[in-house]
Amino acid sequence: LMTVASSSGPAILIPADVAGYNYILQNPVEQHRKDYPGRRALGSEETTGCGTRGIYFDAHGKGHMVAHNRKPNGPDSLLNCIERGWKFYDERPYLAGLFYWTGFDYRGEPNPMKFPATGSQFGILDYCGFPKDEAWYLKSWWTNEPVLHILPHWNLQGHEGDSIDIWVYSNCDEVELTVNGKKLDRKPMPRNGHLSWKAVFQPGAVKAVGYKNGKKILAR
């Protein structure tokens, strides 16, 4: 089979056996489906937008970038975030899946940051192979192994009194969150999604408990 990776426009896709889409933001995938209903297609490149591992506040002067999934556009925007990319392809059974750019951080192409940043931070893993938060998002929905991952870490000195968005990536049916000894809501996990709570930061501890079929199976 012949395939092609397209960043826009249908002309180059017409002779291909398998259409490859580089970024749903740049391609009219739904229109192509109507125009070429028999065309096989996949995501030949879709961004993760993962940012700097362990960083939850932008500091571009230090080369630090928050993951796009947690930016104001949100995970349901088409703008460069891992969650929307996976949802888009999972919701469309006529698409064969996707390749994420990238698996690892790499030297060069620091977009959207400038010097002193010298490398891309869009990897699912950092330069040393340590998983970023978004690796746990994918593991939640790509494996049957129970997953329960909390972010951010709770060592946020300097942000005392600030309202913090606490997220959980998990494939549990429900998750209950406790912040500094106070239980917050127990929430059902949406398919291919995440859960979030707001809490005012004070030093202490955050705990999550995951439930399957009404039974506690994980605690973090």
Q: Where are the predicted features?
A:
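Extracellular and select intracellular beta-sandwich modules with Ser/Thr-enriched
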Residues: 216-220
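Extended substrate-binding grooves/exosites of carbohydrate-active enzymes
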Residues: 1-188, 194-215
